[in-house]
Regions:
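C-terminal membrane-exit region of the final transmembrane helix in multipass inner-membrane proteins
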Residues: 342-353, 357-358, 377-415
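Cytosolic juxtamembrane regulatory segments of multi-pass membrane proteins
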Residues: 376, 411-428
Length: 428
């Protein structure tokens, strides 16, 4: 080993450019490969990560009935229930004490969504894409989806005078005029743009209605004023496994003729994951292509670097160094370059991680920034080192054998030459 180390130190100044080329190629192209595979995994898991960050419900049931929160909490498998109510409680203030009825609201494209006991604030939490979340204890703060803001022509930071009415008032024939006095007058502050956790990926048909969302502090006083469409978000003891049993219990407990609509979170999750799968597959394939490219080109550079050592290896063989020592002498620098390049590849892969995930989840992804995907980093490092080191060892041994054969041929030629000279002298 001392011979190999001595040979490496004395020849490094002539070969450092070869080693640097191997390091940069393996590090940069291999890093792109590792980064791409990591991005593929991060993209594919992005919706599950986002959904988990919202404290999701396991199922929802939409009912047109008086508030049934306590009744729906009774089934043994139900751990917690929170409620939102679909009701146009508030309208922009118009002239002379009458509400203004925008076309977006009268058509149903934009509707009010009020949190009753914390739904959308502590469970199925909204993802904020601009501004901030409304304070659930403030009556004069609200948030909207981006589509609702466009429909209404409002923006984050805007103060909107609004009138609020009970269900009974809205059912009066004179509603919409100054004859019906609002139950509450407020200057509402639009503090944020949000995305619901089940609306990150939407089909065209699901884009309406879209929502302006009011706090529990504002919604609670209006909940008991009439019958609304209420959405009950249920968290179950054993997650999606309990959904069929709870559905049966709810259906059995409802009044005859009641209409209901179930919404299962795991179904939505599966649909979204399937929709982003093509992007993650494309990233994974690109990463594999980059990895193969790095290995093939690096293998060629290693072969060229070892070929340049042939002259020195012949000298070492002539000095009596055995074949194994000859091979290790030429491998020391190359193996060091391979390991350094593999480390650099992991560094590049980590540096590229803030570019992922890609796709619709990126805007709401909670864990953006640098990511250390240790399975990808570790496996990538091992593959690069093992594959290139194996190729380097095989090439070095092959060249060492070739050098040994060449040296024996030279020795044989020398012996034959001396023998021929001796015979010539004797003949004379």
């Amino acid at each position: 080993m001392r011979v190999a180390w001595y040979w490496f130190r004395t020849s490094f100044h002539r070969r450092w450019t070869n080693y640097l080329t191997i390091v940069l190629l393996v590090g940069l192209v291999g890093g792109i490969a590792i980064g791409s595979v990591g991005a593929a995994r991060r993209t594919q898991s992005s919706f599950n990560v986002f959904l988990a960050s919202t404290n999701p419900s396991d199922m929802n049931v939409l009912l047109y009935a008086p508030n049934l929160t306590s009744k729906l909490s009774r089934p043994p498998l139900v751990r917690h229930v929170e409620v939102t109510t679909f009701a146009d409680l508030g309208f922009p203030a118009g002239r002379h004490g009458a509400p203004r009825l925008p076309a977006a609201m009268t058509s149903g494209d934009v509707t009010g969504l009020g949190s009753v006991n914390g739904e959308l604030f502590s469970q199925d939490k909204l993802a904020v894409t601009a501004g901030r979340m409304a304070n659930p204890n403030k009556v004069n703060q609200f948030v909207m989806t981006a589509a609702a803001e466009r429909e209404m022509g409002w923006h984050v930071g805007q103060a909107v005078p609004m009138y609020f009415y009970t269900t009974a008032q809205e059912n009066l024939s004179t509603f919409g005029t100054a004859k019906v006095k609002p139950s509450l007058r407020l200057t509402m502050h639009l503090v944020g743009t949000v995305v619901l956790n089940d609306e990150v990926v939407l089909d065209e048909v699901d884009r309406v209605p879209t929502f302006m969302i009011f706090t529990p502090a504002l919604t609670r006083p209006f909940v008991g004023t009439g019958v609304h469409f209420d959405n009950y978000a249920l968290q179950l003891d054993h997650g999606a496994r309990d959904v069929p049993a709870v559905e049966r219990e709810i259906i059995a407990a409802l009044p005859r003729g009641a209409t209901y609509n179930f919404h299962v979170t795991s179904t939505v999750s599966g649909q979204v994951n399937r929709s982003i799968k093509p992007e993650s597959i494309a990233l994974g394939i690109f990463g594999l292509i980059a990895a193969l490219t790095a290995l093939v080109i690096a293998g060629g550079l290693i072969a060229r670097a070892l070929q340049r050592d042939d002259g020195d290896l012949e000298i070492l063989r002539a000095l009596g160094v055995n074949r194994m020592m000859t091979a290790s002498s030429s491998l020391l620098g190359v193996l060091g370059a391979i390991v350094t390049g593999a480390v650099l590849a992991d560094v590049v892969g980590v540096a590229l991680s803030p570019l992922s995930p890609i796709g619709p989840i990126r805007a709401v992804y909670p864990d953006g920034g640098v990511s250390f995907d240790w399975p990808v980093l570790g496996l990538g490092f091992v593959i690069v080192v093992v594959a290139l080191a194996a190729a380097a060892v095989a090439l070095a041994q092959r060249r060492a054998r070739r050098t040994a054969v060449h040296q024996r041929m030279l020795d044989l030629s020398s012996v034959l030459g001396r023998h021929a000279c001796s015979e010539t002298s004797a003949f004379r």
